[in-house]
Amino acid sequence: MNTLRSFLTASLSRVYRRAEKIAFEEWARRNIVLGSKESIDNPGAYDPSHSYYAPRLFDVFMTGHEWRTLSIMKSSQSGITLHALILIARVLAEAPTNILYVLDTKSKSTDLSKNRLQPLLKGCRALTDTFAEAEDELNNLSYSFPGCTLGLRGAGTAGQVASDPIGLAIGDEVDKWPDQKVESHIWDLLVNRIKRSEFGKAIGFSSPTVEVGKIN
């Protein structure tokens, strides 16, 4: 019995870790290291002083059970995408659930995954063992981790999104996603997918625009 209990405890501990009751920005400061491609001016350990609103916004949303969806209008230098990637790292480290990240095109998703997400996850101190164990299960658009999967998709067809059961959905550049003539808008499909999870969350962000173009 003791042997079985030890085996089950060891197996579960590979997937589930006790969440640290610390603020988003403090967790990032302890665990995230930014490469020169991610932060040209300030590579190295994450510094919360460089972004005031984004970490606090995600902190309030993720810890508030009264909210299931969050919509953000962001500028190009707001750091929202970076903090969304950091959020993914924390979820993988502390409360693994299936995650889906959607951009308007597959090529953008591939670029984000290869050049930003993978380096950030690989350098995350809280994911050192998890990333090493899962490294053979990685490619540019799909990641298999103990207890969950992480996928990146282009929003070209609703079918790419509709079939994925997810606990955390992130929609980037939602304003650029194609409109569906027959099916529901892809953002609505994402929101429907997270409703299957008791604690599912969906975050969508886009750039504010005026008639002449994007506001920077």
Label each residue range with its predicted role.
Residues 2-216:
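Phosphate/NTP-binding elements of NTP-utilizing enzymes
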